[in-house]
């Protein structure tokens, strides 16, 4: 019978790409991990890893074993959590959440507050994180819940081994200086804003890609992207103080932003989906956190 500890080591090596990376993460020596994996290969009766330069990758047999090992290890984690909850008489455990900035403020923080009242024995640890980092961290059990985003026309990678649930959908709104001539209308044609300087996230981000695409496809122009920051609050301040424009989601704007005009594009709806990503097997504590995030998300977007 295969040892769960060795299966965990195999999954860690697969996730990190090197024996040395797994050793650093787990606090073992590389030789100790190599010895344990050699035993696992003997138990499996076939090679599980092959070297590619300085890295290692799974053989076909290794891929089969890691897939089943993930199911087994997630099941063990869930069983241990349920036993702890039964022993305590209530849901308990540590749940680690990752989220992008605006969801952290509008969804995660309110959910943590409600969990403190409803489930005081759940310890929530939360960090700002981009969704690209989430899937490996979820598989390696470094993260339990990820709140991610997906702009229209820019689909995220599909992870069939993880569970994705819809949380909310936001509008992307045009944010202008209050005294801009187009701010007088309820809806603003993007084409009328070709002469504006713009503030957007850094190159290579989903927001930047969305911004360029909207200006090109709806407005017919190449935007003058003069200001860059991955902090949406900085982008709002740049609109307020420099006369720039921005395209920002509802979660950033909240119930309103003083000193700026917030309008919908006249050409039609542009949006962003916000979703929850977890392992397929959820502990009672993770399920409680997911429920709290869903409830907080239902109240997070403005009624305008």
What are these regions (language model features)?
Residues 161-198, 284-287:
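Flexible hinge/capping segments at coil-to-helix
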Residues 107, 261-304:
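A late-sequence structural motif
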Residues 156-165, 170, 233-281:
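Beta-alpha-beta core module
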Residues 12-29:
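Short helix-boundary/capping micro-motifs
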Residues 92-155:
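Central regulatory/effector-binding core of bacterial HTH transcription factors
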Residues 130-135, 139-143, 149, 204-261:
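Hydrophobic hinge/microswitch elements
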Residues 41-63:
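A short LG(V/I)-centered, amphipathic sequence patch enriched
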